[in-house]
A protein has these predicted regions:
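An N-terminal assembly and electron-transfer interface module characteristic of large anaerobic redox
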Residues: 1-413
Length: 413
């Protein structure tokens, strides 16, 4: 259900009903709160309001007699109170177990109120994980509301979330695109107002905001847009790490027919990075670094971290694979790291002495059993030139701290 909510959370003109007990709404609220604090930590402000989210508040007796009456009342309440232009209904595990026919209620409400009322009947976790609801909602919007229209030159549609329009990922992507003379029309799903859905296919290019663990479903969404509306997509290349940022800029330049300008931009951005690295190299050069990994292979690629440390001329003493990883994940990491020349790889406790002796530990998990300075490897990666510089700055500041007292630092603006 929370995936359905995130897919339209800031789409002005929409409203969402969870056909669920009241507690289910708390999950969505917690997700929004975490995103809010991350944006505040980066010194940014949220400029978009969330759409109304209402629970039908299924009670214990409704699990016996059915909860469609509660859903009908909730629809009436939302229509009279918020006057949405489009209403989404997400069903919970409880509604799925009861067998409430939320789809029929949605169809009746659409006829009664004269607006689109769309049910995403995934029955909470019975229908799959968070991403299932998110992608199904997005695909439903594309199929029902997007309309063929003439492409507007230089207009870009961003696909994905990555902390929203005010997050570091999107702001840096917009900055790099502006250097190529490209303008972002909007971000879908989750942030494009309902009245703008029909004209979304006017974009010349769609850019997937991806990470190491990018779901095939997001790329599938890009394929759907290309098949139905002829929107070319940039996917499978993401501006994470300097090498990938260069490839990403070149690919966009190629699709936009301006490769030479893309090359000039890369040269200028490289000068920025080189200038910053030169200013901190007297602190970072020769320092001993250890990388600690406890995040699954689907969500993290150590090559970007290794590349950053090499740019700072730090000594990579070892990679430690934490005990929470499966044997399969450890084997995959050993294979990936094996491509990076001769970096030793150790299991959990076998690497404790190396961690304690290092100047800095770059880690996916906070470690309490060491006084070595720790840097938290972001779950939502820092991207582009600014992202690289932010990582470098965080490592530099951490190395400048007096003494070794443990604790962990984060990359922020």
């Amino acid at each position: 259900m929370s995936g359905v909510w995130r897919a339209v959370a800031c789409c002005r003109g929409c409203a969402v009903i969870f056909h669920s007990p009241m507690g289910c709404v708390h999950v969505a609220e917690t997700m929004d709160l975490g995103s809010h604090y991350r944006i505040l930590a980066d010194g940014r402000q949220e400029n978009m309001e969330c759409v109304p989210l209402v629970s039908s508040n299924i009670r214990e007796k409704d699990s016996i007699f059915g909860g469609t009456g509660r859903l009908r009342q909730s629809i009436s309440y939302v229509m009279e109170t918020y006057h949405p232009e489009c209403l989404f209904i997400a069903t919970s595990c409880v509604a799925g177990v009861i067998g409430d026919d939320a789809e029929s209620e949605s169809a009746d409400a659409e006829m009664r109120y004269g607006i689109p009322v769309i049910c995403i009947p995934y029955a909470g976790f019975l229908g799959g994980e968070y991403s299932e609801g998110y992608y199904k909602t997005a695909e439903t919007i594309i199929e029902r509301f997007f309309r063929p229209c003439e492409h507007v030159p230089n207009r870009i549609l961003l696909l994905g979330d990555q902390m929203g329009p005010e997050g570091q990922y999107v702001t840096e992507v917009k900055r790099l695109l502006s250097l190529l003379g490209l303008e972002v029309q909007g971000q879908f799903p989750g942030y494009l107002p309902f009245p703008e859905w029909a004209n979304a296919p006017a974009a010349e290019l769609a850019i997937v905001l991806g990470t190491t663990g990018q779901s095939d479903r997001m790329n599938g969404m890009a394929d759907l847009l290309e098949k139905k509306f002829g929107i070319h997509a940039v996917k499978d290349i993401y501006p994470i790490g300097w090498e990938n940022t260069c490839k990403w800029i070149l690919e966009i330049g190629r699709l936009h027919g301006n490769v030479e300008k893309a090359k000039v931009i890369i040269e200028e951005e490289k000068k920025r990075i080189d200038s910053y690295v030169k200013s901190i190299l007297h602190i970072t050069k020769g320092k001993k670094a250890v990388i600690g990994i406890g995040r699954g292979t689907h969500w993290y690629n150590p090559s970007d971290t290794i590349s950053a440390l090499r740019q700072l001329e730090m000594r990579i003493e070892a990679v430690i694979l934490y005990d929470n990883l499966t044997d399969k994940e450890k084997a995959e990491y050993r294979h990936r790291i094996g491509k990076e020349e001769s970096i030793p790889v150790y299991d959990g406790r076998d690497g404790q002495e190396l961690i304690d002796a290092a100047d800095i530990l770059l880690t996916t998990n906070e470690i309490v059993s060491t006084k070595t300075k720790q840097f938290f490897i972001p779950m939502v990666p820092m991207v582009g030139t600014n992202g690289e510089i932010m990582i470098f700055r965080a490592l530099y500041r951490l190395l400048c701290r007096y003494g070794n007292k443990g604790g962990i630092a984060y990359a922020t603006i």
